[in-house]
Amino acid sequence: MSTTKPICLVPLHVVIVGAGIGGLSAAVALANRGHSVLILESTSELSHVGAGVALPPTTRKWYESEGVLQVDDTACVPLEGIEITKWDTGELVTRTAANPAGKQTAIHHGDMQLALLARARELTNVEIRLGARVVDVDLEATVALLADGQRVAGDLIIAADGVKSTLKAKVCPPEAVVPLPTGEAAYRFTLPRELLESDAELRELVQRPWGVRWDGPSCHVVAYPLRNHRLLNVVLIHPDNGDAKESWTSVTDKQNVLADYQGWNPTLLKLIALAPPEVPNFRMFLYSPAPVWVKGSTILLGDSCHAMLPYLGQGVAQAVEDATAIATVLSLIETRKQLPLALRAYESSRKERVDQIQAATYRAREQLHLRDGDAQAARDSQRKATSGTGQNSDVVKMQQSYWTWDAAGVAEKTLAALIIA
């Protein structure tokens, strides 16, 4: 991504609904380019929720260029690559090192949000209002309507209010808002290094700069270190047994997790045994690609228009690309009359790419969750044959496709073409 931040020619007042990673990323990008930003967040306090996320190298560099993360930030762990193992024996199937685009960076979701919040608060042209719940938007007037009756006007409203977006229904037709259950859920927990030190196998998982993935029938598990190797992040995707909810606060008994992974690799079972008595259990839904991202001067951004399943780890990256694109086009317009063109360029430069990634993410789970048999054996044989060669098709090709995208450059070219037309 381009690190050049052109100062805007037409300063705008932008209202952002939601102080998640997408909303805060957009706020920082816009403020760095000279726009004034008001963030309206429904919660009265930003809690330290979620688990680990893996930032592609372009996303990490973008955060550094925007003053959010430091090159040597201790909240981060640069990952050398990922090791994929057999679900039951733990046999190494393939090892894929970082490709020429760079290394992924592992960081806790809460740490990422707090770093963004700290940067936003450093910027004098950003205001954050907590406990400000937006219930509607007046599309014609570009006014956000709050639960307490307040009306907040702006030149532009960005709906970055997440997977359960209130404002998506104002921009998209009703059928685009209804989520479909995937039949899968995710257990998530983190383990402090102190719990792992006494076991050599577990200690290695947290001290090495590598991710590990176990792929098995209808399930897969990912583990990697966080916070300068002081935490181990563990995510376990499994069939939804009806116990989960679409909420970060939904939990289940640890014994249910152990039962779901009975017969899996003993190293993994030791990790689960160390988990808290109650383990977060998040139900996963499939959200159809939003057919429209822009209506009037209100736009969708991040999960509100393209909520991602976790199979390719693209949720944060695509929200950051959205933030980059909208900040780029708004900083290039020369008159307010060009704002509609800028918003068209934002959607046009982003939608096709995001739709393709959403579809690829859904397809990826089929390869991850193959049952024991010929198809699984063929997959693992191909992985072994390409291990260490840089040609592992299900990892390296994804990196080449997703990790080298120039969201700013594409947005700039799209806007230029619209202006000329």
From Swiss-Prot:
One term under GO cellular component: membrane
Membrane topology: Single-pass membrane protein
Positions annotated to bind FAD: 41, 54, 303, 316
Pathway terms, separated by semicolons: Secondary metabolite biosynthesis; terpenoid biosynthesis
Active-site residues from the entry: 188
UniProt cofactor(s): FAD
Subcellular localization(s) per the UniProt record: Membrane
Keywords in alphabetical order: FAD, Flavoprotein, Membrane, Monooxygenase, Oxidoreductase, Transmembrane, Transmembrane helix
EC category name: oxidoreductase
Role, per record: FAD-dependent monooxygenase; part of the gene cluster that mediates the biosynthesis of the meroterpenoids arthripenoids. The pathway begins with the HR-PKS atnH that catalyzes two chain-extension steps to form a reduced triketide, which then primes the SAT domain in the NR-PKS atnG to initiate three more cycles of extension to give a linear hexaketide corresponding to the polyketide part of arthripenoids.
Name listed for the protein in its UniProt record: FAD-dependent monooxygenase atnJ
Disruption-associated phenotype: Abolishes the production of arthripenoids but leads to the accumulation of new product which has no double bond in the side chain.
Region (Disordered): 371-392
Protein family (similarity comment): Belongs to the paxM FAD-dependent monooxygenase family.
Gene Ontology BP annotations: terpenoid biosynthetic process
A UniProt-annotated Pfam family: FAD_binding_3
Positions of transmembrane segments: 9-29
Molecular-function annotations in GO: FAD binding; monooxygenase activity
Organism: Arthrinium sp
UniProt-listed Enzyme Commission number(s): 1.-.-.-
